[in-house]
Amino acid sequence: MKQTKTKYGKMKQIASNLKLPDYRYEQLTKAIFHQRIDNFHDMHILPKALRIALVNEFGKNVSSVTPIFSQDSKQAQKLLFELTDGERIEAVGLKYKQGWESFCISSQCGCSFGCRFCATGSAGFKRNLTADEITDQLLYFYFNDHRLNSISFMGMGEAFANPELFDAVKILTDQNLFGLSQRRITISTIGIIPGIQRLTKEFPQVNLAFSLHSPFESQRSDLMPINKRFPLNEVMKTLDEHIIHTGRRVFIAYIMLEGINDSKEHAEAIIGLLRNRGSWEHLYHIDLIPYNSTDKTTFKFQSSSAIKQFCSTLKKASISATVRTQFGSEISAACGQLCYENEL
């Protein structure tokens, strides 16, 4: 990552151009990440010349995303952010009873992959987010006194389709910035093989989630056109390599669509897909997700009893599986529901 590519590199360069000692940049990052100061004018520990230069470069605020709409439910908050060019993205904060806070952030404005059950793609693809725009979603929550316990790239867009993703992860794991452990971060993918391979090499401890949704190649290609480019069989081989290299569990997301992918044959095919892969096969975990309805798709919600039966079939075959407990569906903040066209 080039030093001046992200805002933090630019901040360091600005201090250097002013011929200030290195500790001034350290004071700046501490003001952001220890004192949670979002306004450069309020960073009184910094020389006035540096504060003015920072405002001239970035504007008065550290964060570049502006919240313009918010919806809350009992355990979820969905925020609509506007970017400096007027584009919009959504992010979701989740709060659990134990006090744990998790945040689902976006990596793209819209999505180009056209998964039939997902509302995000209906808005079309606008552009990739920069590394700063990705991480600034979290800065907003942090500046508003939230605890960044865990992060998931499960918002709008396919994370591995955005080259800026890895710079964003570097920022998140930099001990002088966000300082997050790799194991507190989860990246979800529809199966972009080069992205999985790069993650394996560069961030082996980051959690990986793979969106399966059908164990049959032809049906998966129909539901998820990306399967024609990266067939399931090839993706699974790549996931095997990831597990062998990292020793880490891979989560396989499976949205339950009534009458589409919920049959006994589907369960048996999943069992066949995960069996006899090798000594590491126990590190695959199936995450069954109740479908969240939207006005953008025509699929139907599967009953909880049917989902539990599907899960039971997998478990009887010694497949690790659970049914995901979801929050935020009532405010369209759950899996597959993010679509900023619904707002305002």
UniProtKB/Swiss-Prot annotation:
UniProtKB keywords: 4Fe-4S, Antibiotic resistance, Cytoplasm, Disulfide bond, Iron, Iron-sulfur, Metal-binding, Methyltransferase, rRNA processing, S-adenosyl-L-methionine, Transferase
InterPro entries, per database record: Aldolase_TIM (IPR013785), Methyltransferase_A (IPR040072), rRNA_lsu_MeTfrase_Cfr (IPR022881), rRNA_lsu_MTrfase_RlmN/Cfr (IPR004383), rSAM (IPR007197)
SUPFAM superfamilies associated with the record: Radical SAM enzymes
Residue ranges occupied by any Radical SAM core domain in the UniProt entry: 97-330
Free-text cofactor note: Binds 1 [4Fe-4S] cluster. The cluster is coordinated with 3 cysteines and an exchangeable S-adenosyl-L-methionine.
PANTHER family: 23S RRNA METHYLTRANSFERASE (PTHR30544), RADICAL SAM CORE DOMAIN-CONTAINING PROTEIN (PTHR30544:SF5)
Protein name, as recorded: Ribosomal RNA large subunit methyltransferase Cfr
Protein's organism: Clostridium botulinum (strain Hall / ATCC 3502 / NCTC 13319 / Type A)
Gene encoding the protein: cfr
